[in-house]
């Protein structure tokens, strides 16, 4: 079931990128990557201030989070800090990007603009899905963990995305370990 949802999301991203075109999609993808970079740089500064948020019980009775070897509570707060910073940066960059998107209205090489936009649309949704699945993998919710455990596509995205799979695991398990 999760595999079908992921495939639909990836198809929608591709079609949206096709509709938006390369220029607008490039602005959106760049803002997405910059938001991830911003969150990755500053989440360690924010995570220690989030302990007022109650952490779930990460006791042995919870579903196994097999690829995390570090402190799950630290990973939980790191994930929250990362997501909050990501959302803030994404909103600010989207506002800036909306001013730059005026360039996308110039009718220059429309088909190339659309095809390259489709590729970037796919990449944007893939990266978003990757981050969403990674955050979901930290949450000790039985139904969610079971759904993710049955999804071969989620497993491939989480564990085999070049560079990002190892990076997020390393980043999120460092603090407090």
From Swiss-Prot:
TM stretches of this protein: 4-24, 33-53, 80-100, 115-135
According to Swiss-Prot or TrEMBL, what is its membrane topology? Multi-pass membrane protein
| Keyword terms | Cell membrane, Membrane, Transmembrane, Transmembrane helix
Q: What is one GO cellular-component annotation here?
A: plasma membrane
* UniProt-listed InterPro entries: Colicin-V_CvpA (IPR003825)
Pfam families annotated for this entry? Answer: Colicin_V
Q: Where in the cell is it found?
A: Cell membrane
Gene Ontology terms describing biological process: toxin biosynthetic process
| The protein, known as | Uncharacterized transmembrane protein YshB
Please name the source species. Bacillus subtilis (strain 168)
């Amino acid at each position: 079931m999760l595999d079908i949802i992921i495939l639909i999301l990836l198809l929608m991203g591709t079609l949206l990128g096709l509709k938006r075109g390369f220029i607008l999609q490039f602005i959106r993808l760049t803002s997405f990557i910059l938001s991830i970079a911003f969150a990755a740089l500053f989440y360690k500064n924010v995570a220690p201030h989030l302990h007022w948020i109650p952490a779930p019980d990460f006791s042995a009775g919870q579903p196994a989070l097999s690829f995390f070897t570090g402190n799950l509570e630290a990973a939980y707060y790191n994930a929250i800090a990362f997501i909050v910073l990501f959302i803030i940066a994404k909103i600010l960059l989207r506002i800036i990007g909306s001013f730059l998107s005026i360039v996308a209205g110039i009718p220059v090489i429309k088909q190339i603009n659309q095809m390259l936009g489709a590729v970037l649309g796919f990449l944007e949704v893939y990266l978003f899905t990757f981050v969403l699945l990674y955050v979901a993998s930290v949450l000790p919710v039985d139904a969610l963990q079971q759904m993710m455990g049955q999804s071969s596509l989620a497993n491939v995205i989480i564990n085999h995305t070049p560079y990002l799979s190892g990076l997020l695991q390393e980043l999120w398990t460092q603090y407090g370990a």
